[in-house]
């Protein structure tokens, strides 16, 4: 006797901890081999075949039987009869060209078993074609029996498998064990799976009326895998993860065979217990550790009488069996195997209610369908299709971001050229051209990173975008902070200390920021292991997905440190911008520009930081747009004012110091000749009108790239300061009756008049300020050198024209080289006041600039002078007080 069995899929070895073959098919194979051996049928007479394969699967044995037992004599007679009948129908078989028919003829099959109800039509046709062939079909359709009522062959058998009992038991036990009172279920889109879902939930409600059910429907094409763009394993992982997020602690399914194996494997990875059902045989090691219970059915107990009758050549009428309802537990010998973690109280509860559960199954009207329940008790989470729509970045957005970034890169290159061209102009030199170049280079890095970001998702782009954007922002922010930190140190200097900070001294700070950023990015790359992964904008529906970069937990920690690092740099920059608000020179005061730039960065970082960590959809477009805005805002805020100032003020700048600085080179060349020639009134006038205070000289030579240039600029600036002081010394040391004093009068000036023997004074109101002053007989009013009296009309006596005494080392003469004569030591006479002092007339603009430039430095000294003047007016020693006042002004 030869048996032929049909099944859909075979089970492979090696699943789940050296798990043996399991599943309904394999269980039936083992049981069938066992009972046939007991009946004396050799194993090589049993053949298992997969209908989905074109060739027979010789999983077990060859078809040739060389050694027949004595018990097979009757079988041989039956085989001969079958062969005769089959030969009579050979013409009909050849016309059908059915591989099943060929196998039956070639292998001389006596009995064929179909495992699935979907092949009921094949079983019915074969039974009608081969009248002497015993045909058995196991009906796994829990809705109804197979439509084989018109089959008159008395060797056709139908066995109804009790799926409902197993499913109801799974639901009953799940309701007892669940701690959250929320259970999950996964089913396919088959009609019978909906019935299994109803049965599962009905069993759970029998044991726990408060339980809730959440389920997904998996719409997967198992026959044509090419119709699916998503692997079945990933779909199960998505659905299981979503159920766990909703508070589910137990999950069951209607999957079978390989699909059930995949489902169990995923549950084990999530550390979720497996609910065995549907007769799956699981090895004891797995059962003890991971499976809550098994319900195993021995189908061969019902098949055994059929095979025995076939061996004994006894025909049994199966009409009563064909239309039978599902067999009960006693007929299939159900065995429940529980996990040791389940308490004895639950086990006793199940065993005591097992008969009640069977009676509920036999009466289908007691089962409540899911569509009859309210939404509070059962929740349909939707359908997960095997073909999930992939939504990449829109081509319009990709092209738009790429084009905009490319245009901005071109604009930055043009700005870079302008910086190099106009680096010596006040608007750019005052802003440190070296660091302006760093800012522009950083912006180019960011835009290149944005272009790579939207070009696609792979391992390279996931890492490159982090490196380029992060290093670009560090270079930009570092350049802004460091260059303004120097301005703060120079201008926030009340005591006017000499501070020299060159670009070479600042570059290590920018380099340090850059290297620290490289270190953090290395940690992100090494620990994060950025790889592409699929993101679902709608976590519950899973209708579409995007591909983004996934980062491991170690990389996320380094990313948090990187974001904190940027926050610290930005806060320092905001503080520095607040400190340099005191600078009253437009080219140096970038407080508003820096503040606005950093505020825009803070605003965008508050949006970018959460999106960088999250896995939501469409964050690529938001992040790229944010980075484009940050760089564009910084470049616009920092450079538009500089180009505007270049257009308005040109090469001279907005302040007198830049005009002085531009002409200081030519003045230094003629320094020796002009300072040694007191008769050169023009050079003396220019020196005396120099409006550069010490505060200006502190930063005129500080914005250089090397120490040598800084030293040269420093010495020249100091020379200018000494040069200005020499003018004061020369004017104050000229004697009233000397030739030098007489030469200082403007003889060619038509407004000049010779003084009389006695000076004639006019009221201060007759010569309004700032009328050009001349040292005629008319005294000066409201000036630091004008003789003061109580009513401001009486001329000051013994004023600054009184010669200095022995406190000066060498007395000056007309040419400033001859020692002073003895006449210097004689006291001043009244007539000496008649000799006028002459200064070069000053225009209102020059006088205004001089007063504004000197006022920050001399403000405190003027107060001291006024106080001293009041004391001098009541003092008897007017000569000594005048010398003290002149010395304080010169200092």
From Swiss-Prot:
The record places the following residue ranges in the Extracellular compartment, namely 1-399, 455-461, 527-555, 614-625
Could you mention a single GO BP entry for this protein? G protein-coupled receptor signaling pathway
Cellular compartments annotated: Membrane
Q: GO MF terms on file?
A: G protein-coupled receptor activity
| Pfam families in the record | 7tm_3
Q: Where is the composition biased (Polar residues)?
A: 742-767, 783-820
Q: Which residues are glycosylated?
A: 52, 85, 88, 125, 132, 224, 298, 312, 320, 325, 353, 363, 375
> What top-level branch of life does the organism fall under?
Eukaryota
Give the main localization category. Answer: membrane
Q: How does it sit in the membrane?
A: Multi-pass membrane protein
**Locations of Low complexity compositional bias?**
772-782, 882-891
Database matches in PROSITE patterns:
G_PROTEIN_RECEP_F3_4
Q: Which residues cross the membrane?
A: 400-420, 434-454, 462-482, 506-526, 556-576, 593-613, 626-646
Listed Acidic residues bias regions:
872-881
Q: Where is the signal peptide?
A: none
Region Disordered, residue ranges: 52-91, 660-689, 742-827, 869-891
One GO CC term of this entry? extracellular matrix
Membrane side Cytoplasmic: residue ranges: 421-433, 483-505, 577-592, 647-891
Keywords per UniProt: G-protein coupled receptor, Glycoprotein, Membrane, Receptor, Transducer, Transmembrane, Transmembrane helix
The UniProt family comment states: Belongs to the G-protein coupled receptor 3 family. GABA-B receptor subfamily.
Mind telling me what this protein is named?
A: Metabotropic glutamate receptor-like protein N
Q: Which organism is it from?
A: Dictyostelium discoideum (Social amoeba)
Which gene carries the instructions for this protein? grlN
């Amino acid at each position: 006797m030869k048996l032929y069995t049909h099944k859909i899929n075979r089970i492979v070895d090696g699943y789940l901890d050296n798990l043996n073959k399991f599943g309904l098919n394999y269980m039936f194979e083992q049981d069938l081999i066992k009972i046939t051996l007991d009946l004396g049928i050799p194993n090589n007479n049993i053949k298992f075949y997969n209908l989905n394969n074109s060739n027979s699967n010789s999983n077990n044995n060859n078809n040739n039987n060389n050694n027949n037992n004595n018990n097979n004599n009757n079988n041989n007679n039956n085989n001969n009869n079958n062969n005769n009948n089959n030969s009579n129908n050979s013409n009909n078989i050849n016309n059908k060209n059915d591989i099943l028919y060929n196998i039956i003829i070639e292998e001389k099959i006596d009995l064929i078993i179909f495992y699935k109800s979907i092949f009921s039509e094949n079983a019915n046709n074969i039974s009608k074609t081969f009248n002497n062939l015993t045909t058995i079909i196991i009906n796994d359709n829990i809705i109804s029996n197979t439509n084989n009522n018109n089959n008159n062959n008395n060797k056709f058998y139908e066995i109804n498998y009790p799926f409902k009992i197993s499913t109801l038991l799974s639901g009953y036990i799940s309701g007892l064990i669940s701690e959250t009172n929320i259970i999950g279920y996964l089913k396919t889109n088959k009609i019978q799976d909906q019935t299994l879902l109803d049965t599962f939930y009905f069993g759970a409600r029998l044991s726990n009326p408060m339980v809730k059910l959440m389920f997904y429907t998996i719409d997967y094409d198992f026959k044509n895998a090419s119709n699916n763009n998503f692997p079945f394993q990933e779909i199960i992982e998505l659905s299981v993860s979503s159920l766990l997020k909703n508070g589910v602690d137990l999950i069951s399914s209607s999957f079978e065979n390989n699909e059930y194996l995949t489902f169990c494997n995923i549950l084990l990875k999530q550390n979720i217990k497996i609910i065995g059902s549907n007769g799956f045989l699981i090895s004891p090691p797995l059962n003890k550790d991971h499976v809550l219970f098994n319900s195993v059915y021995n189908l061969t107990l019902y098949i055994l009488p059929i095979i025995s009758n076939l061996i004994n050549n006894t025909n049994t009428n199966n009409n009563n069996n064909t239309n039978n309802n599902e067999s009960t537990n006693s007929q299939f010998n159900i065995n429940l195997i529980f996990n040791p973690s389940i308490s004895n109280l639950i086990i006793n509860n199940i065993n005591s209610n097992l008969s009640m559960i069977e009676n509920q199954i036999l009466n289908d009207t007691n089962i409540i369908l899911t569509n009859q329940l309210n939404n509070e008790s059962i929740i349909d989470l939707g359908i997960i299709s095997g073909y999930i729509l992939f939504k990449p970045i829109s081509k319009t957005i990709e092209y738009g971001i790429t084009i905009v970034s490319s245009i901005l890169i071109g604009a930055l290159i043009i700005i870079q050229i302008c910086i190099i061209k106009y680096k010596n102009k006040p608007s750019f030199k005052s802003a440190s051209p070296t660091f302006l170049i760093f800012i522009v280079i950083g912006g180019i890095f960011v835009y290149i990173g944005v272009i790579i970001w939207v070009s696609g998702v792979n391992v390279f782009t996931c890492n490159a975008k982090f490196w380029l954007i992060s290093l670009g922002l560090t270079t930009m922010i570092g350049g802004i902070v460091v260059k303004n930190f120097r301005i703060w140190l120079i201008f926030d200097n009340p005591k006017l200390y000499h501070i020299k900070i060159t670009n070479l001294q600042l570059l290590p700070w920018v380099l340090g920021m850059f290297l620290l950023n490289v270190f953090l990015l290395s940690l992100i790359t090494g620990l994060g292991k950025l790889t592409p992964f699929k993101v679902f904008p709608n976590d519950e529906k899973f209708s579409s997905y995007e591909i983004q970069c996934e980062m491991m937990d170690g990389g996320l920690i380094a990313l948090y440190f990187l974001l904190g690092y940027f926050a610290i740099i930005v806060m320092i920059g905001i503080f520095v911008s607040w400190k340099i608000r005191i600078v009253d020179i437009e080219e140096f005061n970038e407080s508003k520009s820096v503040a606005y730039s950093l505020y825009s960065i803070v605003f965008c970082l508050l949006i970018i930081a959460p999106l960088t960590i999250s896995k939501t959809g469409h964050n690529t477009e938001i992040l790229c747009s944010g980075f484009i805005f940050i760089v564009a805002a910084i470049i616009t805020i920092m450079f538009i004012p500089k180009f505007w100032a270049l257009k308005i003020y040109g090469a001279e700048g907005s302040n007198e110091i830049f005009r002085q600085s531009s002409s200081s080179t030519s003045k230094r060349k003629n320094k020796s000749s002009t300072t040694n020639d007191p008769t050169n009134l023009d050079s003396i006038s220019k020196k005396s009108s120099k409006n550069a205070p010490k505060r200006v000289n502190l930063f005129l030579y500080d914005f250089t790239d090397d120490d040598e240039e800084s030293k040269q600029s420093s010495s020249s600036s100091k020379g200018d300061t000494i040069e200005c002081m020499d003018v004061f010394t020369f004017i104050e040391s000229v004697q009233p009756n000397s030739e030098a004093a007489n030469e200082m009068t403007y003889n060619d000036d038509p407004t000049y008049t010779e003084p009389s023997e006695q000076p004639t004074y006019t009221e201060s109101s007759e010569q309004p300020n700032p009328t050009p002053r001349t040292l005629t007989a008319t005294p000066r009013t409201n000036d630091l050198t004008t003789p003061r009296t109580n009513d401001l009309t009486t001329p000051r006596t013994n004023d600054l024209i009184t010669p200095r005494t022995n406190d000066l080392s060498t007395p000056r003469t007309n040419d400033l080289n001859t020692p002073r004569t003895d006449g210097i030591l004689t006291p001043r006479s009244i007539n000496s006041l008649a000799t006028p002092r002459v200064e070069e007339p000053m225009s209102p603009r020059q006088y205004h600039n001089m007063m504004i430039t000197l006022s920050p430095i001399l403000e405190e000294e003027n107060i001291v002078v006024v106080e001293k003047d009041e004391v001098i007016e009541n003092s008897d020693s007017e000569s000594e007080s005048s010398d003290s006042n002149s010395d304080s002004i010169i200092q």
